Regions:
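Acidic catalytic motifs of isoprenoid enzymes
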Residues: 1-159, 166, 170-206
């Protein structure tokens, strides 16, 4: 709830719509490690209007909100560039005014995120099927996001972010494979899915 609230306060309702569980996990992780001053409160929202929900906000909440917005912004841009999805164009344009401030606050992180997403995009255009390569690129993005600062925790945080990023990429590919086949969209698992029965495919992915 704290992340949702800060997304709305910092970036408006459109920012609030970018809420993700991976950035929520990042807040919990960084807060547990660094034990920053945290402000506890309560809030109501459209999703749960009848009762107040507890919120906890600290510097990592704002950081995660910024990273959340950057990832969503580039995703929307890619949707427009690759598939000419009008929703992607509209969403990217709506988020654009907020992006410049994030770029100035976290220039190195934004630069790496943008570079890796561009790399992913280029491989997608080539129809790359190397799962480890593709998942690893998104893992690099999450590794950079999870590394809050160069300190004793940095290496461990990068490892957590990297492998979580790989898992997220693979799970998204697995869940979207049938939809992507129907839409003729890129998915590194398409070839494997088409060569097997759904049951065989599911079993192989689980193992």
């Amino acid at each position: 709830c704290g992340l949702c609230r800060r997304l709305k306060e910092c970036y408006g309702k459109r920012g609030q719509l970018t809420l993700s569980y991976d950035m929520t996990f990042l807040i919990v992780l960084l807060t547990g490690l660094y034990e920053p001053k945290t402000i506890a409160g309560e809030t109501r929202c459209i999703a749960h209007p009848l009762e107040k929900h507890p919120t906890k906000i600290n510097e990592y909440t704002d950081y995660a909100a910024s990273m959340n917005l950057i990832l969503s912004y580039y995703k929307c841009k890619d949707d427009w560039i690759d598939e000419r999805k009008k929703k992607g164009y509209i969403a990217a344009k709506a988020l654009e005014p907020k992006i410049k401030k994030i770029e100035s606050n976290y220039p190195e992180k934004v630069r790496l995120i943008h570079s890796k997403l561009e790399e992913i995009n280029q491989y997608e255009k080539k129809g790359e099927t190397n799962l480890d390569l593709m998942a690893g690129l998104f893992g690099d993005i999450m590794a950079e996001i999870f590394a809050w600062e160069p300190d004793a925790w940095e290496l461990s945080l990068r490892k957590i972010g990297f492998f979580l990023g790989k898992f997220i990429y693979l799970m998204d590919a697995y869940e979207d494979v049938e939809k992507d086949i129907g839409n003729n969209s890129y998915n590194p698992l398409k070839e494997a899915f088409l060569q097997k029965t759904p049951e065989q495919f599911a079993t192989e992915c689980r193992t």
